[in-house]
Amino acid sequence: MAGKPLLVSDDYPSSFEPDIYLSTYYSDPSPTPLLGDMMTFSLTQFQQAFASGQIKGRLIDFGTGPTITSVISASEHCESILLAEFSPQNRNILKQWQSGELKHSFAKFLDYALKLDGKGDSVADRESSMREKVSGIIPCDIRKENIFAPCFISSVDVITSSLCLESVARSIAEYESQAARLASVLRPGGHLVLFGCIGGSFYTVGSHRFSSFGMTSSELQAAWTKAGMKIITWKEGRRPNPEQKEESDTDGFFALVAKKA
Protein backbone atom coordinates (compact mmCIF):
# COMPACT_ATOMS: atom_id res chain seq x y z
CA MET A 1 0.00 0.00 0.00
CA ALA A 2 2.98 2.30 0.62
CA GLY A 3 3.46 2.80 -3.11
CA LYS A 4 -0.14 3.73 -3.84
CA PRO A 5 -0.93 7.33 -4.74
CA LEU A 6 -2.81 9.47 -2.23
CA LEU A 7 -6.43 10.05 -3.12
CA VAL A 8 -7.80 13.58 -2.78
CA SER A 9 -11.15 15.35 -2.54
CA ASP A 10 -12.38 14.60 -6.05
CA ASP A 11 -11.72 10.88 -5.49
CA TYR A 12 -14.15 10.61 -2.57
CA PRO A 13 -17.36 10.06 -4.59
CA SER A 14 -15.83 7.12 -6.48
CA SER A 15 -13.39 5.64 -3.96
CA PHE A 16 -14.46 6.37 -0.36
CA GLU A 17 -16.21 3.34 1.16
CA PRO A 18 -18.31 4.46 4.14
CA ASP A 19 -19.10 0.94 5.39
CA ILE A 20 -15.39 0.11 5.69
CA TYR A 21 -14.66 3.50 7.25
CA LEU A 22 -17.35 2.96 9.89
CA SER A 23 -16.25 -0.58 10.73
CA THR A 24 -12.59 0.51 10.95
CA TYR A 25 -12.92 3.69 12.99
CA TYR A 26 -16.46 3.88 14.42
CA SER A 27 -17.28 0.50 15.93
CA ASP A 28 -16.06 1.28 19.45
CA PRO A 29 -14.63 4.48 20.97
CA SER A 30 -12.36 2.57 23.38
CA PRO A 31 -8.62 3.31 23.08
CA THR A 32 -6.66 1.18 20.60
CA PRO A 33 -2.89 0.58 20.17
CA LEU A 34 -2.95 2.51 16.89
CA LEU A 35 -5.30 5.44 17.57
CA GLY A 36 -4.92 5.63 21.34
CA ASP A 37 -7.71 7.60 22.96
CA MET A 38 -8.50 9.62 19.83
CA MET A 39 -12.21 8.77 19.81
CA THR A 40 -12.80 9.18 23.54
CA PHE A 41 -10.82 12.44 23.39
CA SER A 42 -13.12 13.69 20.62
CA LEU A 43 -16.31 12.75 22.47
CA THR A 44 -15.02 14.27 25.70
CA GLN A 45 -14.01 17.56 24.10
CA PHE A 46 -17.36 17.95 22.32
CA GLN A 47 -19.18 17.21 25.58
CA GLN A 48 -17.11 19.73 27.53
CA ALA A 49 -17.57 22.39 24.86
CA PHE A 50 -21.37 22.22 25.11
CA ALA A 51 -21.72 21.38 28.82
CA SER A 52 -21.77 25.03 29.93
CA GLY A 53 -24.88 25.70 27.87
CA GLN A 54 -23.30 28.85 26.43
CA ILE A 55 -22.90 27.37 22.93
CA LYS A 56 -26.36 26.94 21.45
CA GLY A 57 -28.73 27.90 18.63
CA ARG A 58 -28.79 26.75 15.01
CA LEU A 59 -25.94 24.38 14.18
CA ILE A 60 -24.24 23.11 11.03
CA ASP A 61 -21.97 20.08 11.25
CA PHE A 62 -19.58 20.57 8.36
CA GLY A 63 -18.05 17.57 6.60
CA THR A 64 -20.08 15.14 8.68
CA GLY A 65 -18.88 12.08 6.78
CA PRO A 66 -20.92 8.94 7.44
CA THR A 67 -20.96 9.50 11.22
CA ILE A 68 -23.05 11.49 13.72
CA THR A 69 -20.65 11.49 16.67
CA SER A 70 -19.79 15.20 16.40
CA VAL A 71 -23.33 16.25 17.27
CA ILE A 72 -24.21 13.84 20.11
CA SER A 73 -23.51 16.40 22.84
CA ALA A 74 -24.44 19.40 20.68
CA SER A 75 -27.92 18.02 20.07
CA GLU A 76 -28.99 18.76 23.64
CA HIS A 77 -28.17 22.46 23.29
CA CYS A 78 -28.99 23.30 19.67
CA GLU A 79 -32.50 23.81 18.37
CA SER A 80 -31.79 22.55 14.87
CA ILE A 81 -28.97 20.68 13.14
CA LEU A 82 -27.92 20.67 9.49
CA LEU A 83 -25.56 17.89 8.41
CA ALA A 84 -23.39 19.05 5.49
CA GLU A 85 -21.37 16.43 3.62
CA PHE A 86 -19.43 16.38 0.32
CA SER A 87 -19.74 12.72 -0.72
CA PRO A 88 -23.10 11.43 -2.00
CA GLN A 89 -22.52 7.97 -0.52
CA ASN A 90 -21.92 9.50 2.92
CA ARG A 91 -25.07 11.58 2.66
CA ASN A 92 -26.91 8.37 1.84
CA ILE A 93 -25.55 6.77 5.03
CA LEU A 94 -26.71 9.78 7.05
CA LYS A 95 -30.19 9.52 5.53
CA GLN A 96 -30.27 5.83 6.45
CA TRP A 97 -29.30 6.72 10.01
CA GLN A 98 -31.98 9.41 10.28
CA SER A 99 -34.68 7.04 9.01
CA GLY A 100 -33.51 4.27 11.36
CA GLU A 101 -32.52 1.97 8.49
CA LEU A 102 -28.73 2.06 8.98
CA LYS A 103 -27.30 -1.31 10.03
CA HIS A 104 -24.19 0.22 11.61
CA SER A 105 -24.70 1.19 15.26
CA PHE A 106 -23.30 4.25 17.03
CA ALA A 107 -24.65 2.99 20.37
CA LYS A 108 -21.24 2.67 22.06
CA PHE A 109 -20.38 6.26 21.10
CA LEU A 110 -23.73 7.51 22.31
CA ASP A 111 -23.36 5.57 25.56
CA TYR A 112 -19.91 7.05 26.20
CA ALA A 113 -21.09 10.62 25.55
CA LEU A 114 -24.21 10.15 27.71
CA LYS A 115 -22.13 8.89 30.63
CA LEU A 116 -20.07 12.05 30.34
CA ASP A 117 -23.29 14.09 30.51
CA GLY A 118 -24.35 12.19 33.61
CA LYS A 119 -28.06 12.94 33.12
CA GLY A 120 -29.28 9.38 32.84
CA ASP A 121 -30.60 9.70 29.28
CA SER A 122 -30.97 6.45 27.38
CA VAL A 123 -29.16 5.81 24.10
CA ALA A 124 -32.47 5.26 22.32
CA ASP A 125 -33.99 8.52 23.61
CA ARG A 126 -30.94 10.62 22.69
CA GLU A 127 -30.67 9.12 19.23
CA SER A 128 -34.38 9.72 18.64
CA SER A 129 -34.00 13.34 19.75
CA MET A 130 -31.02 13.79 17.43
CA ARG A 131 -32.93 12.44 14.46
CA GLU A 132 -35.78 14.86 15.13
CA LYS A 133 -33.45 17.85 15.36
CA VAL A 134 -31.71 17.15 12.05
CA SER A 135 -33.51 19.55 9.74
CA GLY A 136 -31.57 18.62 6.62
CA ILE A 137 -28.71 16.64 5.06
CA ILE A 138 -27.15 18.85 2.42
CA PRO A 139 -24.15 18.85 0.05
CA CYS A 140 -21.10 20.98 0.72
CA ASP A 141 -17.73 21.75 -0.85
CA ILE A 142 -15.34 23.97 1.11
CA ARG A 143 -13.47 24.77 -2.13
CA LYS A 144 -16.42 26.74 -3.53
CA GLU A 145 -17.36 30.33 -2.78
CA ASN A 146 -20.86 29.15 -1.82
CA ILE A 147 -19.80 26.10 0.14
CA PHE A 148 -23.37 24.78 0.38
CA ALA A 149 -24.33 25.15 -3.31
CA PRO A 150 -26.99 24.69 -4.55
CA CYS A 151 -28.33 25.54 -1.08
CA PHE A 152 -27.73 28.93 0.48
CA ILE A 153 -27.10 29.33 4.21
CA SER A 154 -26.93 32.93 5.45
CA SER A 155 -25.47 32.43 8.93
CA VAL A 156 -25.64 30.06 11.88
CA ASP A 157 -24.87 30.18 15.59
CA VAL A 158 -22.63 27.11 15.82
CA ILE A 159 -20.40 25.09 13.51
CA THR A 160 -19.01 21.71 14.49
CA SER A 161 -16.59 19.76 12.31
CA SER A 162 -14.42 16.67 12.65
CA LEU A 163 -11.49 15.51 10.54
CA CYS A 164 -12.60 17.51 7.53
CA LEU A 165 -10.44 20.41 6.40
CA GLU A 166 -7.20 18.41 6.58
CA SER A 167 -8.69 15.97 4.06
CA VAL A 168 -9.31 18.79 1.57
CA ALA A 169 -6.44 21.28 1.91
CA ARG A 170 -3.14 20.61 0.14
CA SER A 171 -1.21 23.57 1.55
CA ILE A 172 -1.27 26.00 4.47
CA ALA A 173 -2.58 28.72 2.15
CA GLU A 174 -5.47 26.49 1.07
CA TYR A 175 -6.28 25.58 4.68
CA GLU A 176 -6.29 29.26 5.67
CA SER A 177 -8.60 30.12 2.78
CA GLN A 178 -10.97 27.30 3.64
CA ALA A 179 -10.95 28.19 7.34
CA ALA A 180 -11.92 31.76 6.46
CA ARG A 181 -14.68 30.50 4.16
CA LEU A 182 -16.14 28.29 6.89
CA ALA A 183 -15.86 31.03 9.53
CA SER A 184 -17.81 33.37 7.25
CA VAL A 185 -20.92 31.23 7.78
CA LEU A 186 -20.93 32.00 11.51
CA ARG A 187 -22.81 35.01 12.84
CA PRO A 188 -20.75 37.49 14.90
CA GLY A 189 -20.38 35.95 18.35
CA GLY A 190 -21.03 32.45 16.96
CA HIS A 191 -18.94 29.46 17.99
CA LEU A 192 -16.79 26.89 16.23
CA VAL A 193 -16.09 23.50 17.83
CA LEU A 194 -13.49 21.63 15.79
CA PHE A 195 -11.73 18.27 16.05
CA GLY A 196 -8.83 17.44 13.76
CA CYS A 197 -5.39 15.94 13.20
CA ILE A 198 -1.93 17.30 13.91
CA GLY A 199 0.79 16.41 11.41
CA GLY A 200 0.78 13.46 9.07
CA SER A 201 -0.08 13.03 5.40
CA PHE A 202 -2.61 10.20 5.00
CA TYR A 203 -5.20 7.86 6.46
CA THR A 204 -6.53 4.61 5.02
CA VAL A 205 -9.98 3.25 4.26
CA GLY A 206 -9.77 -0.33 3.09
CA SER A 207 -7.20 -0.51 0.30
CA HIS A 208 -7.21 3.25 -0.36
CA ARG A 209 -4.97 5.94 1.09
CA PHE A 210 -6.50 9.40 1.38
CA SER A 211 -4.63 12.66 1.79
CA SER A 212 -4.60 14.28 5.24
CA PHE A 213 -2.66 17.52 5.15
CA GLY A 214 -0.50 17.76 8.27
CA MET A 215 -0.01 21.07 10.08
CA THR A 216 1.59 21.92 13.40
CA SER A 217 -0.38 23.15 16.40
CA SER A 218 0.88 26.71 15.91
CA GLU A 219 0.02 26.69 12.18
CA LEU A 220 -3.51 25.48 12.90
CA GLN A 221 -4.13 28.06 15.61
CA ALA A 222 -2.71 30.81 13.41
CA ALA A 223 -5.03 29.82 10.55
CA TRP A 224 -8.17 30.11 12.69
CA THR A 225 -7.02 33.35 14.28
CA LYS A 226 -6.40 34.74 10.79
CA ALA A 227 -9.95 33.65 9.89
CA GLY A 228 -11.33 35.99 12.55
CA MET A 229 -11.83 33.44 15.31
CA LYS A 230 -10.82 34.03 18.91
CA ILE A 231 -9.57 30.75 20.34
CA ILE A 232 -11.18 29.99 23.71
CA THR A 233 -9.74 26.53 24.34
CA TRP A 234 -7.14 24.39 22.58
CA LYS A 235 -6.42 20.83 23.68
CA GLU A 236 -4.42 18.09 22.03
CA GLY A 237 -3.44 14.45 22.35
CA ARG A 238 -0.84 12.20 20.79
CA ARG A 239 -0.94 8.79 19.15
CA PRO A 240 0.64 6.20 21.47
CA ASN A 241 2.65 4.45 18.74
CA PRO A 242 3.46 7.00 16.03
CA GLU A 243 5.85 4.54 14.39
CA GLN A 244 2.85 2.42 13.37
CA LYS A 245 1.77 3.88 10.06
CA GLU A 246 -0.47 1.20 8.55
CA GLU A 247 -3.73 3.15 8.89
CA SER A 248 -2.43 6.69 9.37
CA ASP A 249 0.78 8.62 9.93
CA THR A 250 -0.72 11.53 11.86
CA ASP A 251 1.21 12.67 14.94
CA GLY A 252 -1.81 13.46 17.09
CA PHE A 253 -5.11 15.27 17.29
CA PHE A 254 -6.63 18.45 18.68
CA ALA A 255 -9.87 20.06 19.76
CA LEU A 256 -10.53 23.76 19.37
CA VAL A 257 -13.34 25.96 20.65
CA ALA A 258 -13.38 29.45 19.16
CA LYS A 259 -15.69 32.45 19.00
CA LYS A 260 -16.19 34.75 16.04
CA ALA A 261 -15.42 38.39 16.75
Where do the protein language model's features map onto the residues?
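Class I SAM-dependent methyltransferase Rossmann-like catalytic core
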Residues: 2-56, 69
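S-adenosyl-L-methionine
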Residues: 98-149
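Conserved class I S-adenosyl-L-methionine
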Residues: 54-67, 80-85
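Acceptor-substrate binding/catalytic loop of class I
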Residues: 170, 194, 200-222
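A short glycine-rich, Lys/Arg-flanked "PGG" loop and its adjoining helix->strand segment in the class I
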Residues: 152-153, 173-188
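Core SAM-dependent methyltransferase catalytic element
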Residues: 227-261
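A short SAM/SAH-binding and catalytic strip from SAM-dependent methyltransferases
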Residues: 143-144, 156-172
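Short alpha-helix
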Residues: 119-126, 211-228
